[in-house]
Amino acid sequence: MKRILFMGTPQFAVPSLEEFAKNFKVIGVVAQPDKPAGRGKKLTPPPTKVLAQKLGIPIYQPEKKKELIPLVEELKPDCIVVVAYGKILPKEVLDLPPYKTINLHASLLPKYRGAAPIQRAIMAGEKETGNTVMLVNEEMDAGDILAQEKIPIEEEDNFLTLSEKLAKSGAKLLVNTLRLWFEGKVKPVPQNHEEATYAPPVQKEEYRICWKASAESVRDRIRGLYPNAYTTFRGNRIKILKARVVDLEGYPGEIQDTKRLIVACGEKSLEILELISPKGKKMRGEDFMRGYRPQLYEPFNSE
C-alpha cells in the first residue's frame, strides 16, 4: 500500500483526509500551527489535526517552510497530497516523493488560480465550477492537470454550501485519480496558461456591500462572502445572509418598502430574506422590519 503524506489545514481538507485514511496508508498529516479563535482567543487546533488525532495519525505543524524538507526526507512518502494546506511548498520538497506532489484545487483550472476560488466564482456569477487534481510545481496552481470534475453552482448556493459540495466530491475525485496515477494510467495535461484567471484572497473592504452595484452583483457578493457580507443601519453593522433580486428601481441604498426589507441597488433592488441583526441574532427580513421599523427611503448604509 502506497505511503501518503497528507498536507491540509481547514475544514475543506477533512473529507479528503477521511477518504485517504480509508484507502491508503497515511503516514502523517501536516497542518498549519494552532491559532487563537473565538472571543476568548483560545488556541484552537485546525480541523485536520482534530481528525488526525482521532484516527491515530501522526501530526506535524512546522512553523517554517524550511522545516518541511528534513521532515519529508525522514518520512519518505510515496506521494505528498495537498488540500488547502495554506502555504506554498519549497521546491526541494515537491519532487522528493517518487509519485510527486499532488494537489486538489477547487476550480476548473486554469480559471481561478489562487487562494479564494470558491468565493470568486460565486461573486462573479458563475453557473459552474469544479475540482482539479494536478501536479504541484513552483508556480501557483499552474501544474499539469491529472483530472477535473465539473459541478453546477445552484442559485441557492453560497460559500458554505458550495464548499461542502466541492470538498466531498473533490475527496472522491482525488482518491480515484491517485489510484490511477499509481497504476500509470493517468497522463498529465499541461494547462493553457493564456486562459488563466486569478482568485486573490478576499480583502477586508470587500465584505462591505456597495449598493451602487447591480442587484445581481450584490446578491452574488452576499452568496460568495457568506456569512460575512455586511452593511450598516443607524450606525450598527448588519450581516446579510440571503437575498433575492426584485424588479424595482430606487436610489441605491434606500429602503423601498414598509413591510418587506427591500433595498434599492444601482440596477433593480434586493429583498433581504435573512440577516444577522446588530445584536447578533439571525432573523428574517420581515422580522427586522417589524422590530426596527425603518422608514420608507431610509438609507440602509448609514453610519
From Swiss-Prot:
<keyword id="KW-0808">Transferase</keyword>
<dbReference type="GO" id="GO:0005829">
    <property type="term" value="C:cytosol"/>
</dbReference>
<protein>
    <recommendedName>
        <fullName>Methionyl-tRNA formyltransferase</fullName>
        <ecNumber>2.1.2.9</ecNumber>
    </recommendedName>
</protein>
<feature type="binding site">
    <location>
        <begin position="107"/>
        <end position="110"/>
    </location>
    <ligand>
        <name>(6S)-5,6,7,8-tetrahydrofolate</name>
    </ligand>
</feature>
<dbReference type="Pfam" id="PF00551">
    <property type="entry name" value="Formyl_trans_N"/>
</dbReference>
<dbReference type="InterPro" id="IPR002376">
    <property type="entry name" value="Formyl_transf_N"/>
</dbReference>
<dbReference type="InterPro" id="IPR001555">
    <property type="entry name" value="GART_AS"/>
</dbReference>
<dbReference type="Pfam" id="PF02911">
    <property type="entry name" value="Formyl_trans_C"/>
</dbReference>
<dbReference type="GO" id="GO:0004479">
    <property type="term" value="F:methionyl-tRNA formyltransferase activity"/>
</dbReference>
<dbReference type="InterPro" id="IPR036477">
    <property type="entry name" value="Formyl_transf_N_sf"/>
</dbReference>
<dbReference type="GO" id="GO:0071951">
    <property type="term" value="P:conversion of methionyl-tRNA to N-formyl-methionyl-tRNA"/>
</dbReference>
<dbReference type="InterPro" id="IPR011034">
    <property type="entry name" value="Formyl_transferase-like_C_sf"/>
</dbReference>
<keyword id="KW-0648">Protein biosynthesis</keyword>
<dbReference type="InterPro" id="IPR005794">
    <property type="entry name" value="Fmt"/>
</dbReference>
<dbReference type="InterPro" id="IPR044135">
    <property type="entry name" value="Met-tRNA-FMT_C"/>
</dbReference>
<comment type="function">
    <text>Attaches a formyl group to the free amino group of methionyl-tRNA(fMet). The formyl group appears to play a dual role in the initiator identity of N-formylmethionyl-tRNA by promoting its recognition by IF2 and preventing the misappropriation of this tRNA by the elongation apparatus.</text>
</comment>
<dbReference type="InterPro" id="IPR005793">
    <property type="entry name" value="Formyl_trans_C"/>
</dbReference>
<dbReference type="InterPro" id="IPR041711">
    <property type="entry name" value="Met-tRNA-FMT_N"/>
</dbReference>
<comment type="similarity">
    <text>Belongs to the Fmt family.</text>
</comment>
